[in-house]
Amino acid sequence: MRELDEMISRLRNRGIKVEKVKYPKQTLSEKKWVHQCKQPLKTNYRDFNGYSFT
């Protein structure tokens, strides 16, 4: 997980707020639906190993 930590510290240095989040399984199934949707939906990155990027 060191690569992930380095990437997160680089993002923090650029001023992107990164935090570890826990979300219910309902959100995971919604996320799959979003990926299957043809039109790109603009959302926060809330996808990367439970990290939230805003």
Swiss-Prot record:
Effects seen without this gene: Deletion of the gene causes a decrease in the overall Spx levels, as well as a change in the dynamics of Spx accumulation.
Up-regulation conditions: Induced under cell wall stress, but not disulfide stress, and this induction requires the CssRS two-component system, which responds to both secretion stress and cell wall antibiotics. Phosphorylated CssR acts as an anti-repressor by antagonizing YuxN repression.
InterPro entries in the record: SpxO-like
Domain of life of the organism encoding this protein: Bacteria
Described function: Inhibitor of Spx proteolytic control. Acts by interacting with SpxH/YjbH, which disrupts interaction between SpxH and Spx, and inhibits SpxH-enhanced proteolysis of Spx by ClpXP. Required for the stabilization of Spx and activation of Spx-regulated genes in response to cell wall stress.
Complex and partners: Interacts with SpxH.
Protein name listed in UniProt: Anti-adapter protein SpxO
Annotated source species: Bacillus subtilis (strain 168)
Name of the gene: spxO
